[in-house]
Every structure is written in C-alpha cells, then in structure tokens.
Regions:
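Positively charged n-region of N-terminal signal peptides that target proteins for export
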Residues: 1-4
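C-terminal motif of bacterial Sec signal peptides marking the signal peptidase cleavage site
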Residues: 14-15
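N-terminal substrate-binding region of glycoside hydrolase catalytic domains
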Residues: 23-147, 264-267, 271-322
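Short, well-ordered coil/turn segments that N-cap beta-strands
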Residues: 62-64, 97-101, 165-170, 212-217, ...
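Conserved, mostly hydrophobic/aromatic
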Residues: 66, 94, 159, 172, ...
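Active-site groove signature of glycoside hydrolases
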Residues: 128-194
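Extracellular/luminal regions of secreted and cell-surface proteins that mediate adhesion/ECM remodeling
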Residues: 332-423
Length: 423
C-alpha cells in the first residue's frame, strides 16, 4: 500500500523533525525570508464543470477541472481499430482553457442505446438486453460475450498506452452498470449478463493495475456492494491502488450507506488514489444548498471535504445556485495544499521545510525546486499533516532565488502555489 515516507534527497539525509532550532537541522544554513500566498484553485483539484458548460470558458480562472463521458463506440467501431480522434479533440479543447480533464467511460445511460461497438453488437451469440430504467427504455450490454470482455480490456490497455502520461488528463473514472456507477438499481440486473461476472471483474482489476503507471483510475464506491463486485470476497484486490467516486455526495443520509461504502475501501485509501464524485441529485434541495456557507443537514461542504479527504467533485449545476467566487472558495478547500515553513541557503545548497496543509496528497510527481534545481523527494508522498526537509544542491541555487514547485503533469497556464511566511 502506501510507501513509508522516504526523506533522502540528492546527496544528504535530511531530517523530518518538526521542531527545527538553531542547534538542529541545517543550523549552519542562513534562513531566507519568504512570503507567498495560495490565491487560486490548485491544479488537479476542486469543483468540476462539464466541458460543455459555458462557465468553463467565461469563468475559467475559478476552476481547474472539466468533466466528460467518453463512449466506447465513439473510439472503436471495428475490431482492433481504435480512432482516438474524439478523445484528442476533447483533451485539446479542455487544455486550451488551462484546465485538465476528468473522463468517465461508460456503456449504459438511462434512456439511451448501449455504447458497445457495432461490430460486437453483430457478433454471433451477442444479445443485448432492453428494459425500463427510470421509466425509459434503456439498453444493456451482453457480458456473456467473450469478445466484449476481450475488447473491454484491450480498450483500457490501448488508452493507457496513449494517455497515461498526458498532462491534459487529470483522472480516469470507469466501471459497469448505469452510468458506470457500479449498480443497476432500476432495470434488468442479471449478473454475468447485463452486469459482468465477478470473475471477469477480478481480471479487469488486475489488468488495470498493469496498464496504468501514472494515471490514477477510479471506480464508484458502490463497488463495495458484495452483490455487484468481487471486492468483498477477494479482499486482496483492495491492495491495488485505485481511487473512488461518490455520485451522491452530501445527500441527507450520506453518513449511512455512503459512509459505509467509503470505509469499506479503507479510511486511508485516499493515500493511494483520489476521492471524487458528484453532488447529490437525490433532491433539488441538495443541489441548491450543498455549497451554502451554513451547510445543509448539519454539515458544511468544507467539513465533508476534510472528513472524506476529497480532491474533486462534479458540480455542474452549481453556477446556477452559487457565485463563481463561492465555487472557487469551496474548491480551494479540496485536495493538496503546500506550505513552506522554512527556507535556508548555504552557497549553492538550499534546505526547504515543506508541509501539506491540505486534505489529500497530490497524485502526480511534484518537486520543490530552487533556481531550476529539483530536489529528489516527490511531494506525491507527502500526506496531509506531514512535513519534510528537502535538500537541493546545484548551480542556480542562491538566496536570491525563491523556491518553486515543479510538476511535469500541468498544462500551459497552470501553476502549483504554496503558502509561506518565513521571517
């Protein structure tokens, strides 16, 4: 699971002692005054709007993330022929606004045709199921079909090969059932047919662990249900690092079923993968009041973000109920947040004491740098409440240069900020 905190950088072993004195760590380095503020929503965090939401353009400085579905049959229509043009265009559009994408792959949507590729629909023995879901005719894939199973794995493999390190992509959501939310709460749910068997799902988890090296993929918290997923029976699958999303966040009884689902994956699962989701649509009241400063149902948004270590949340309707300034403010309570508590320099060496004052880690490698010289310690390992001394040595380091936080997984216009009040 989560690696132990390693704090060796460049050529020196550095201390993680939170109480640094003149007789302690780097006492022979000269402290350099440093002041900085976090003024913006940080990359890869915050409230997410659909890529089609006009506010993604007109208020683009208030958010960092955009959301979209991607349909399997938009990319593949013939066997082993993958046309990624729709995905490339989507990523390009989102990045042009200085944002990154949260994408979800899905087959089934209430009231719509199934997004299984046409060639599979014509496959011998394939029989799609139609049924009523929320009163509308909805189509479900035939998971008995071995070609569908093979395609599903191949799709994610090809996607990872192409986009795993693409800075335009923040997070990937995937799954099965209605909206890929890991349930068919209303409609023809037949395990092994309209919903994949536990055996295939086990294979899927293991293969996904092989496909992705950098991108943190996520599944719904509803996968905690022993009926739908093999995770209860095969607890070792929980050792695979993945994130979760909760698509009814903050509804009235969220502290019951939803919390149980979150805790099933482990109280500290946020250390391995991001926690995200969507504001509840259980009632209009939920959408209208989820970001109210005074909260709803006795809970504020910020308190729930802290409790569940949330990094992002889809809130596409929120511009209709809240100001973009409030949306920005709420977004800034999510995810990681760095503070530099001490900055010391000696010749071409620097020592930076940095802490994570946020509610979650950053899920991509990021590094403290001084004068273009990076420390070796990745801030991806810095959990909330932890702090670490980072030692930097090399040409370019001086007391005239302020530290920066460098990350290769950013699009033009993005910057990781930090708080500092070193005197």
């Amino acid at each position: 699971m989560r690696k132990l905190l390693i704090i060796f950088t460049i050529v020196a072993a550095v201390s993680c002692n939170p109480s640094v004195t003149e007789h302690g760590t780097y006492s022979d380095f000269e402290r350099v005054p440093l002041k900085s503020e976090i003024k913006n929503v940080q990359p890869m965090t915050g409230i997410v709007l659909w890529n089609t939401n006009g506010r993604s353009t007109t208020a683009k400085d208030k958010i960092q993330l955009e959301y979209s579905y991607m349909l399997y049959n938009d990319v593949c229509k013939e066997k082993d022929v993958f046309d990624w043009t729709p995905m490339d265009k989507l990523l390009e559009q989102v990045a042009s606004r200085g944002h990154q994408l949260v994408v979800r792959f899905r087959y089934t949507y209430v009231g719509q045709q199934c997004a299984v590729p046409d060639y599979i629909k014509a496959w011998p023995g394939y029989e799609e199921t139609s049924g009523k879901s929320e009163g509308r005719t909805t189509y479900f894939p035939d998971w008995r079909c071995e070609e569908l199973q093979r395609f599903h794995l191949e799709f994610h493999k090809r996607f990872a090969e192409r986009y795993d390190k693409d800075p335009r992509l923040a997070f990937v959501q995937t799954g099965f059932g209605l909206w890929a939310e890991y349930h068919i709460y209303d409609g023809p749910c037949i395990m092994g047919k309209t919903f994949p068997s536990h055996k295939f799902q086990e294979t899927f988890y293991k293969e996904m662990d092989k496909y992705f090296d950098e991108t943190t993929w996520s599944i719904s918290i509803d996968a905690a249900d022993a009926y739908y997923s093999p995770l209860n029976a095969k607890k070792e699958l929980l050792d695979i690092p993945f994130g979760n999303f909760d698509d009814s966040f903050m509804h009235e009884t969220h502290h019951e079923y939803n919390r149980d689902c979150w805790m099933f994956f482990g109280e500290d699962s946020y250390k391995d993968g991001p926690r995200g989701g969507e504001f509840s649509y259980y009632s209009d009241y939920d959408q209208k009041h989820c970001l109210d400063k005074e909260g709803m149902y006795g809970r504020t948004f910020e308190s729930q973000v802290a409790e569940y270590h949330m990094t992002y949340i889809l809130g596409n309707d929120q511009p209709g109920y809240q100001s973009m300034d409030r949306i920005k403010e709420a977004s800034m309570s999510m995810g990681y947040k760095f503070e530099i508590k001490d900055f010391r320099v000696k010749g071409n060496e620097a020592a930076v004491l940095i802490t994570n004052i946020g509610v979650a880690p950053i899920y991509r490698d990021s590094y403290v740098a001084v004068g273009g010289v990076k420390g070796e310690y990745s801030l991806k390992n810095l959990m909330p409440g932890e702090e670490v001394w980072i030692h930097v040595k090399g040409e370019g380091v001086s007391d005239q240069i302020v530290p920066t936080i460098e990350c290769d997984h950013l699009v033009p216009g993005q910057k990781i900020e930090y708080k500092a009040d070193v005197i």
